[in-house]
From Swiss-Prot:
GO MF, any single term: aspartate-tRNA ligase activity
Important for tRNA non-discrimination, annotated site positions: 31, 80
Protein name according to UniProt: Aspartate--tRNA(Asp/Asn) ligase
A GO BP annotation: aspartyl-tRNA aminoacylation
Native source organism of the sequence: Rhodococcus erythropolis (strain PR4 / NBRC 100887)
Keywords tagged on the record: Aminoacyl-tRNA synthetase, ATP-binding, Cytoplasm, Ligase, Nucleotide-binding, Protein biosynthesis
Catalytic activity: tRNA(Asx) + L-aspartate + ATP = L-aspartyl-tRNA(Asx) + AMP + diphosphate
């Protein structure tokens, strides 16, 4: 090794020891001919002093981010010169030897400055030298190790599934890879290991996991990446409770890394309850605001706006004092979400109601409204009326915005909840409107994916009454973020074929795209289920980062661009020709197929 110690490990107990350190010059200071540098390596920073002689002369040429090797003696700093903000602040190294391992060009930005994301990603290798980004990547490694420890204890098998596979629709567009040896044909990068892990269960592996790379060619969305990582788990001969128990054990181990003890069992909430109370299937439970349904309260109203399928309200504590400009801003906020606006009532300090809605209400409605929605004098009540699903979503978003504006969220709190009993199907129009790629050609598509089992009580009716069918699925939510989701899978061929039929996937199409899975189900496939955790999101939460880009070593920027390598990039004409991108695939004849089968048999 080029060094004897890590810079961040030095303490007063090592005084008088001779040490050799390696790292980068974080800062350089010259005090009357005595040179001080802060030497940084992966473990931290130590102060090195060059006092006299040739070594001090050498140190004069040091600049920021020079890579160096230093030998010297550990000394306790004089009283009054300690820096208690860093672990090594009580010592310094009195240098006797200096070797410049590599010089550094002038930096595009100072590593201790606030820098724009584009520059940080373009020079990501410099960005990673900074304490925050570097620590986040190291935490990610610890997170993976902790999960592996739990799974090894339960005798799970880590299996690598293919990353070059066939294109099978799973809810987003595939990234396609041309096959040079079969011009005109393409592999697809996997959106998830879903089908392969189910085949592993059929194969008797029984307990599988993988820290899997996944790829989805989606339109740009905030804080999404075209390639991402999930902890993928599958188990045979289990029910929902078994999966949830294991998942909670993993989460408990992860959150211990940041000093938090998760209380288990984690509460469960049905999808219906979550939407009714919070307007979201991933509610942030760190604050107590809930939606209030007002259909019964306004059942005889003469106010036409409230003569709707759904009328709901959410209370903003102290919101009546908002200036008109802020109330108008709420209207623009709602319009950006596709609504016409956000109706409101202001509750005066004397309990009287004000605002444009109040004058349209009857005396009885005005008298009872505050009590019905739980509003106090000085509060503002926001309303949404119309179709149930979008209006609940609007109020759910308003709930979160209220909490942020009123500073109601404890940044140090952790609130977990399982969301269970979600619908199995949703109208295809709803899925496409939200930006998802709907699988199938009918009016219905799967909410989770096509391989999720219905709850047992819906086995006989899910295809005749898809609107009522519930999925045997479960999502885990932390602080308003969905950090994992899974389900009990379909393991019977007949049920899988019925699900495909509901989604408008013909027998021919099902056989072409999923025939290998349907064939496997015919050979004694066991009951099985699993879960996948969003590894980027979990690590970002544990690291206290707002964006998953902060915990990915080399992330993409908006639109899937990599500023570091300038990917994606055009390919050459020769590459295009060799890859066969423009070739039309040869139609496989039955004769050729038969010949291949015969040769294989020989």
């Amino acid at each position: 090794m080029l060094r004897t110690h890590l810079a961040g490990s030095l303490r007063p107990e090592q005084a008088e020891q001779t040490v050799t350190l390696t790292g980068w010059v974080a800062r350089r200071r010259d005090h009357g001919g005595v040179i001080f540098i802060d030497l940084r390596d992966a473990s931290g920073v130590a102060q090195v002093v060059f006092r006299a002689g040739d070594v001090a002369e050498q140190a004069h040429r040091l600049r920021a981010e020079y890579c160096v090797r230093v030998t010297g003696t550990v000394e306790v700093r004089p009283e009054g010169n300690q820096n208690f903000e860093i672990p090594t602040g009580a010592i310094e190294v009195n240098a006797t030897e200096l070797e410049v391992l590599n010089e550094s060009a002038p930096l595009p930005f100072q590593l201790d400055d606030q820098v724009g994301e584009e520059a940080r990603l373009k020079y990501r290798y410099l960005d990673l030298r900074r304490e925050g980004p570097g620590s986040a990547i190291r935490l990610r490694s610890k997170v993976s190790a902790a999960a592996r420890g739990v799974l090894a204890h339960h005798e799970f098998v880590e299996v690598e599934t293919p990353t070059l596979t066939r294109s099978t629709p799973e809810g987003a567009r595939d990234f396609l890879v041309p096959s040079r040896l079969q011009p005109g044909s393409f592999y697809a990068l996997p959106q998830s290991p879903q089908l392969f892990k189910q085949l592993l269960m059929v194969g008797g592996i029984e307990r599988y996991y993988q820290i899997a790379r996944c790829y989805r060619d989606e339109d740009f969305r905030a804080d999404r990446q075209p390639e991402f990582t999930q902890l993928d788990i599958e188990m045979a001969f289990v029910n929902q409770d078994d999966i949830i128990l294991l998942a909670e054990e993993i989460l408990t181990a992860l959150w211990k890394l940041v000093g938090h003890e998760i209380k288990t069992p984690i509460d469960r909430m049905t999808y219906t309850e979550a939407m009714r109370r919070y307007g979201s299937d991933k509610p942030d439970l760190r604050f107590d605001i809930e939606l209030v349904e007002c259909m019964d309260f306004f059942k005889d109203t003469t106010f036409r706006v409230f003569q709707a399928e759904y009328v709901g309200a959410v209370v903003m504590p102290g919101g009546a004092s908002q200036p008109r400009k802020q109330l108008d801003a709420w209207q623009e906020w709602a319009k950006q979400r596709g609504a016409k606006g956000l109706a409101y009532v202001l509750v005066g300090e004397d309990g009287t109601l004000g605002g444009p809605v109040a004058k349209n209400l009857t005396d009885a409605e005005r008298e009872g409204l505050a009590a019905h929605v739980g509003a106090q004098p000085g509060d503002c009540v926001f309303f949404a009326a119309g179709a149930t699903k979008p209006m609940r979503a609007l109020l759910g978003a308003a709930r979160g915005e209220i909490a942020r504006k009123k500073d109601l969220i404890d940044p140090d709190a952790w609130a977990f909840v399982w969301i269970v009993d979600a619908p199995m199907f949703e109208p295809t129009a709803d899925a496409t409107a939200s930006g998802d790629v709907a699988l199938g050609h009918s009016a219905w598509t799967a909410v989770h994916h096509a391989f999720t089992s219905p709850k047992p009580e819906f086995f006989d009716t899910f295809d005749t009454d898809p609107d009522s069918a519930l999925a045997y699925a479960y999502d885990i939510v932390c602080n308003g973020n969905e950090i994992g989701g899974g389900s009990i899978r379909i393991h019977r061929k007949d049920i899988q074929e019925r699900v495909f039929k509901v989604m408008g996937i013909s027998e021919e199409e099902a056989q072409e795209q999923f025939g290998f899975l349907l064939d496997a189900f015919a050979f004694g496939a066991p009951p099985h289920g699993g879960i996948a955790f969003g590894w980027d999101r979990i690590t970002a939460l544990l690291a206290g980062m707002d964006s998953i880009r902060e915990v990915i070593a080399f992330p993409k920027s908006g639109g899937g661009v990599d500023p570091l390598t300038d990917a994606p990039a055009p390919i050459s004409a020769q590459q295009r020709k060799e890859s066969g991108i423009d070739a039309k695939p040869e139609k496989k004849s039955e004769d050729k197929k038969s010949e291949g089968d015969t040769a294989e048999a020989k």
